[in-house]
Amino acid sequence: LGQQVGGNLFHSFGQFSIDTGESATFSGPNSVNNIIGRVTGGEASFIDGTIRSTIPGANLYLLNPAGLLFGENATLDVSGSVHVSTADYLRLGDGGRFDAHTPGNSVLTVAPVVAFGFLDPPAPITVNGGFLRVPDGQTLSLIGGDITLHNATLYAPAGRIDLVTVGSAGEVLPTDHDLVMQGFGTLGALTIERDPVVARVTVDIGEPLGEIPLGDLDTSGEGGGAIFIRGGQWVNRGGWVFTNTYGARAGR
């Protein structure tokens, strides 16, 4: 059931993986603004099913310092923003902290997440053939060690995509218009790669968009979105990064 503190609903798991065809559903009262989950057992999470939330508009944070791997059948069914990270802790406002590396150091508060904190060395995040989408105007974040997107698409129509790769201890502070990096001695590598021939998928956003090839970052929609990338090295093998405005709303 988790522990609710104000608008934050905290969950703690020893292990967290979703096999093909399975789902994990987060539920709670409509007063919840943020679902914040951590994995403390020291094993990487393999997600090849659906991560779902039944709480309208709630954002989802999933934290596993041991690593995160999304398979080709992984999907998101969340009406708010989604942030996945291999950070060791989340720093909350008002002196709060939700720690996956040392759970006993946690101090739960009603304040929102203000920073992703890393110890050395950060674990990787891999999306292998998946199509991860958030609703219109929401944010999709991958914040960890080396990040690899292989035949995968991240899609945030008229929203925002954050990709941060780090290689040492420090904190990442997302703001409305930037990603602030504090204390990092080294950064990680982002690899976007697509095989020469891959399947295509069609996404209907209410405006003509056509087919989105796998291996892309896309924030196109009624209003142009934003893509923020922070890292030490970026390797792009056949992938695309693009944001277009199809409607009357201004881009960002």
Language-model features, listed with the residues they occupy:
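Extracellular and secretory-pathway beta-repeat/beta-biased strand scaffolds
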Residues: 1-252
